[in-house]
């Protein structure tokens, strides 16, 4: 995967990681080697990002969320927020995203609710097209195109 984010103004964290100088990354986030984080993105506590993932500009990642290997999350996506369901009262729930997914521009994905299984799951090699929404407690298998 190739990032569309220009490499100007990136801060090299080490030889394998490039994070833009304007990205905000919580100290409690866990980020593997080989992860690129673009301008003005916010990575919250409880977020885990595995190697090879590209986070483009203006992406918001909230936890608890685990993002697998070699995913590409495009600009203005919001991933891992709590459910807007009226029954949801802020209980600890999570989001799990597999490997090799493309999450295009403006996609929103909510964590689960305790009234269901407490987790939203996205499998491997999926394409979530621009402005699609994955609601709380959904489970998406592998090789799905979501419009």
Q: Where in this protein do the model-derived segments appear?
A:
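Cationic, low-complexity basic patches in intrinsically disordered or flexible, solvent-exposed regions
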Residues: 3, 7-8
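Short, Lys/Arg-enriched N-terminal segments with co-localized hydrophobic residues
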Residues: 9-17
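Structural signal for interior beta-strand "rungs" in well-ordered beta-sheet cores
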Residues: 19-147
């Amino acid at each position: 995967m190739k990032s569309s984010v220009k490499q100007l103004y990136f801060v090299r964290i080490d030889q394998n990681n490039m994070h833009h100088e304007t990205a905000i990354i919580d100290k409690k986030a866990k980020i593997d080697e080989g992860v690129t984080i673009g301008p003005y993105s916010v990575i919250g506590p409880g977020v885990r990002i595995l190697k090879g993932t590209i986070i483009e500009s203006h992406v918001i990642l909230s936890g608890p969320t685990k993002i697998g290997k070699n995913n590409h999350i495009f600009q203005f996506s919001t991933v891992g927020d709590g459910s807007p369901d009226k029954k949801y009262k802020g209980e600890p729930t999570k989001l799990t995203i597999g490997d090799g997914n493309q999450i295009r521009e403006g996609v929103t994905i909510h964590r689960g609710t305790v009234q269901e299984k407490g987790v939203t799951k996205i499998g491997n090699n999926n394409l979530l097209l621009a402005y699609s929404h994955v609601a709380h407690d959904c489970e998406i298998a592998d090789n799905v195109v979501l419009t």
